[in-house]
Amino acid sequence: MIVPTSHEAMPNFNVLLEGAWLVRDIKTEDDAIGVAISEAGKRLNQKKMDFVEVEMGQWDCPECGDPLAGVFLVASTALVALLFEIKIFNAESEEHAGRIAKSTIGKALGAIPLRVLEIDTIG
């Protein structure tokens, strides 16, 4: 029988998720962004997840590649791109860290579509 001589620590990751937040009965893009960030923060804080950073995302123009504001407003309804950043400790792999992040944040936010954008290993 081979006995390991040392325990290798599992890596830690910084995970960035993108979410699509719908805001109804809104007049301006700025108001939609404020409401989306506020509502997301409130849901995260209710679950004691104030360690998750929330900010507005952006889209890239499919034609020219220039960044566009992460909000689309039509008929008093806005779709706001939000970014959620969380540190995941002791994950088995990048993929595992992404699944943990989506599950953890997804449970707090409810029916908000999430997608992993970026995963970085941290010290």
Model-derived regions: residue spans:
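Helix-coil modules at protein/domain termini and other flexible surface or pore-lining loops
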Residues: 2-5, 9-27, 37, 41-51, ...
